[in-house]
Amino acid sequence: HNPKQTLLQIESEIYPQFPGLLTPQKSLVAAILDSYAHSDEGLWSLREEDSPSARHADLDEMRALITDIGMRLGYETKQLNDKLLTWGDPSEPIYIFRLIASALIREILKDKTFARDAHERSIILLPGGRAGLLAYKQKRDPALRTASRDWRFIKFRLLRTLGEIPLINAQTWEEQIGSDPIEGPPSGQLMMF
């Protein structure tokens, strides 16, 4: 595919693939483009940070940060697969981390690996660029909004910031993980160090 295309070119490629009632609304196409691409003089291209190699490196960095912060908080990190980690014993985890590079969360929400009450301790870690798309999807889909209500979402940038706090403790962790919501600007004050 052409790395730089106009919105009209993109739409002319997308719409024939999803005919009739499957045709995505222009607002969805715009939300996806805003999430993955940038426009320069009307030409859209994939953002550098969204190249497969960059996202792979981000996921590696997030796994390392989860392990490091967990160790500093006194928790042992268990990696159950590339995108699923826990702090503490996986049978009774203190926190559950799901790493994603997209805004696709339905399969995570349906997963029954952990008890339903574990959702309050479940964190979906995603790139900041996906936050707007996820917020858009939650606004448009009441079922998705309801299913994800008890989950916490942390952007990669917030985990990086928390990793830089030299004397992080469990209270600081808990206070800060909600400080950069998926919709809108960060709430409150991010801790300075």
Predicted regions and their residues:
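C-terminal non-catalytic scaffold/interaction domains in large multidomain proteins
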Residues: 1-193
